[in-house]
Regions:
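Flexible helix-coil transition and linker loops at the boundaries of alpha-helical arrays
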Residues: 1-24, 56-61, 124-127
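TPR/TPR-like alpha-solenoid signature
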Residues: 25, 32, 69-71, 138, ...
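Residue-level recognition of tetratricopeptide repeat
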Residues: 36, 73-76, 142, 175
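Residues that mark the junctions of alpha-helical repeat units in TPR/alpha-solenoid scaffolds
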Residues: 20-23, 27, 64-66, 126, ...
């Protein structure tokens, strides 16, 4: 409600991207992180509501991919696979992605254009690569979970926690899922 009647304004993110172009806006960040908070507490109905609102403020391909990915996973957790699949319509192989390549690749996996094992090969190196593995890994784990491959999902979630990057959203989500007995 705080931003309801406020104009859309670019919000500089913590770390500059490769093009030094801030991509997110205040409204996006409010609804994106609200959706994440609901998702992490398994309140998928409220998470979906927040992510749908967030889509309204996803005004570039990076934000569209990030929001679509979390909303897709949220709908999968609710068993709404048809609705989740419909979200993938605007996602194309060629998009203008500056920051959220991991989310873009996950969405292409959901569409059947990438293989899960290509997104999460199970190796890690530098800090950026570790963050990428955590992000990719969580999407792959969730994909396995939602397609009935619970053991494979649990295996990847445990691998994510061994990568030890506790601030990454995928790490936090993996920890929450394992604590809930996924």
């Amino acid at each position: 409600r705080l931003a309801q009647n406020m104009p859309l304004e670019v919000e500089p993110d913590g770390q500059p991207n490769s093009k030094n172009i801030p991509l997110s806006n205040l409204h996006f960040n409010i609804y994106y992180h609200l959706g994440l908070a609901y998702y992490l507490t398994a309140n998928y109905e409220q998470a979906a509501k927040a992510y749908r609102k967030c889509l309204q403020y996803s005004n570039n391909d990076d934000l569209l991919c990030a929001t679509t990915d979390w909303l897709y996973m949220t709908l999968c957790r609710q068993g709404k696979m048809t609705e989740a699949s419909q979200l993938l319509e605007p996602i194309k192989e060629k998009m203008t992605i500056i920051e959220n390549e991991s989310y873009h690749q996950r969405l292409l996996m959901y569409k059947g254009l990438r293989k899960p094992e290509d997104l999460f090969p199970g190796k890690s190196g530098n800090e950026d690569e570790t963050l990428n593995l955590i992000t990719q890994g969580y999407g792959v784990a969730n994909f396995y979970y939602c397609t009935g491959k619970k053991e494979q999902a649990q295996d990847i979630l445990q691998k994510i926690l061994r990568l030890d990057n506790w601030a990454a959203f995928g790490y936090i989500a993996a920890e929450a899922d394992l604590n809930r007995g996924l």
